[in-house]
Structures are given as structure tokens and as C-alpha cells.
Amino acid sequence: MIHQYRNNGYNIVMDVYSGSVHVVDDVCYDVIAEVNKSETEPTAESLKEADVKEKLLQTLGNKYETSDIEDALSDAIELTEGGQLFVKDTYECMIEEVKKRKTVVKALCLHIAHDCNLACKYCFAEEGEYHGRRALMSYEVGKKALDFLIKNSGNRRNLEVDFFGGEPLMNWQVVKDLVAYGREQEKIHNKHFRFTITTNGVLLNDEIQEFVNKEMDNVVLSLDGRKEINDQMRPFRNGKGSYDLIVPKFQKLAESRNQEKYYIRGTFTRNNLDFSNDIMHFADLGFKQMSIEPVVGDESDPYAIREEDIPKIMEEYDKLAKMMIEREKEGKGFNFFHFMIDLNGGPCVAKRLSGCGSGTEYLAVTPWGDLYPCHQFVGQDDFLMGNVDDGIVKPEIADDFRSCNVYSKDKCRNCFAKFYCSGGCMANSYNFHGTIHDTYEIGCEMQRKRVECAIMMKAALADEE
């Protein structure tokens, strides 16, 4: 499968199944496009047939010199022979093996607090309550959750635990106690816990910062961008904005972590479709690690992104990519999560095919110990998998998630970005279509654009080296 596109003056050709990316001149771009119109997948041998050259000369001869067309065809043949162009699908045959693979639990999202001190207007957790009641996780439930993770992690040594909410700092003592318990259990069971925390920063102080820097491998700091944008969507319950309180704390924390192992994480809505300005605002505040996610909501929500917003969003990603290139050239570069693509390595085959591991390798735990496939399914009875006392009592839910992959979704099968997004978010699929075996179309369009921008940036920055 070939995907071709032009962006910021670059002609880019992606070979989906080999993962190869080529930056080519106009004639090579057009030659590849023409031979790719064949009803059958081109091979090195078929490209050498005389009629291929003849058709190219007929089609492109009025645009390019004959010698240039011949050279471009020769390059295409060489790339095809080298397994970098027109590579056949070698992944679909692995699906059954991936579906049958034995999985272990590697990560837990601990809902340490089903309560929050903000009232964000787009919050899927309903101010932290998750379709239920306000509650704080007890130390006893948290211990059982860590014990469950150790017991169900098999031979895997490195385990991940994210303290989530609501707002985790509203239950700070239990967070500290559970980290201490985890460190004790590491020695007993030859495990290593990688703790992370997601916070709105309202309760952040020097004592918490010191502990976080000592014990947390990563910190997610919630902020939506410019003051007027953040305060519109992330107010306190009395309507007052949160920006002025939290930004200085976040700046201090980021500096104390040497601008590493954290993310400023925002959400953009219909209210700020010019979200590239929010990313640049983060950069101007001194942050180096950032992400801004599209809100996901019902179309009836006034802030929800709709299909008619997509052209503007595409423009913003292009604009952001160009601004990031300029900042990098000026020595003021920063990382944007959605443009971070590893073209040399990347995730294993199972991850490329089936995604984040929700429901199988990654689970969410409520304050009272119930287990769900991920934080976005919490509170939905159909996805209650078990609890920390009894373990998984509905393995059929895990089986359903395990069977979900880019080949089980019709919309993914012929998508060039399928190995970069691994089929997208299953919670979004369920919320929009009532099944995890579908995709959220607006999210797909944005993902494809982000992949294109990320690869273009690599080409542009390679030119500077």
C-alpha cells in the first residue's frame, strides 16, 4: 500500500507495509503515482515490462524529459527490489497469533479520587464522579490493586501505575502511602513500578513537587492554553478561572524536572480551533513537552468538534508543523506529542495491530476496587470486568478487546495510518457507534493529518542537518 502527499514543498511517498518513507522529486512522485494505478500491486518484475515505460512516456512525456522519466522508473524498481516500495502486506497473516497471544496486566489507572476541585465543561468524568458518586480510594483498596497487578503481571518486571481522577491530589496521603507500598513490594517480587500522576495543579505545592520529582516517572499537567481559553473551559465550581493559580506552579515543576518527563496536556474545542496559538503559548511560557487533544463529545454539545470544523483543524496542524520547524531552527524547539513518530523503531507488531492494550494489558480501578477496561469505560455496567478482591470475573470482556485490531475494522483496513494509531480509541468507537470494533471518523481524519505533518517535519529538519 502506497500513500502519497505533498506538504510544505515536500513530495512524500509512504510505503505502508515496510514503513519506508521517501522524499522524492516531482517526476519520481508522478511516476510512482502512475504505476500505482495498476489493478494489481506492482512488483519489480512488472515494473520492468516494456509497456510500463511506454505508458509512462505517453502519460508524462509532455511534462518531463524522457531520460528523467526513465531514471525515476529505474529508482522505483530499485526501491521495490530493496523492499522499500510496493511491499506486500505481511501483517494480516499474524492476526490470529496476535488474538491468541497470552497477555498479562502491565498497567493500572488508579482512580485515586472520584472528586475534583474544578468543573471543566467537557469533562467525561462528570467533575470526577464517573456516572456515580464522589469517593476517594482507600489505602486498603489501593494495596489490593497493586497486589492484583503484581499477581497478574506474570514474568513482566516493569509495571506502570497512573494516579488519576478526578483530581488525585485531593487524596494525596493515599498516593504517598501507595507509592511507599509499591516500593516495598518491588523488592519482594522483583518488580519495578513506574508511577505517573495526572493533575490540574490546584493543590500543587513545594512538598508535593519534591515527592513527585523523586517518585513519579512522568507527570501530566492539565492546562488548555491561553488564559481566556483555559478559564472558559476549566473554571472552579464558582466560575472563577484556574489559569493564574496553576501556571506559575506548572512552570516551576517543569523547570525542577529539567523540562523532561512531564507533559502540559490541553484539550481544544470549537471555542479554540486556532489551537496552534495555544501550543505556541505553552512554548512562550517555557514549556518543552506538550500535547493538546481534540475534545470528544456529542455533536449537540456546543463545544464539540463537528465535521465542518475539519478543514480549519487541518490548517492548524499544518500551521503548527511549520512554526515548530522554525522554532527548532532558532534553537527554541519543543516536543508536541502528536507529532512524535519513530520511523526507525516504534512499537512491536502486537501494538501496531491492536493498540493501547485496554481491557487486556491495561485496566482502570475505581475507588471501591472495580475493574474496567480503561478510565473512559468506568461507570458503564457492560464493561465491569471484576474487582481487586475477585480478579477478572468476566474474561469475555477481555477477549472482546483482545480481538479488536486494525483488520477487524473495515475503516482501518485500507488506511495508510493504521500502524501509527493502531485502530484508534476503542472508547470513542463505542461512544459513537455502540461497539469497540469501529472508529471515530473525525478522530481518524485528524490522526491521518498528524501523521502527515510529523513525517513532513522529519524531512524538513533532515534538510537542516
Predicted regions located by residue number:
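Short acidic, hydrophobic short linear motifs in intrinsically disordered regions
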Residues: 40-63
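Radical SAM/AdoMet-radical enzyme domain recognition
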Residues: 142, 146-162, 171-295
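Short Fe-S-cluster ligation motifs
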Residues: 146-164, 400-401, 439-465
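Cysteine-cluster motifs in flexible loop/terminal segments that predominantly coordinate metals
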Residues: 402-453
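C-terminal accessory region of radical SAM enzymes
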Residues: 312-345, 375-422
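Radical SAM enzyme [4Fe-4S]-AdoMet core and its adjacent flexible, acidic
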Residues: 228, 232-244, 251, 255-358, ...
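Acidic, low-complexity/disordered tracts enriched in E/D and polar residues
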Residues: 1-38
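Conserved alpha-helical substructure of the radical SAM core
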Residues: 64, 71, 75, 79, ...
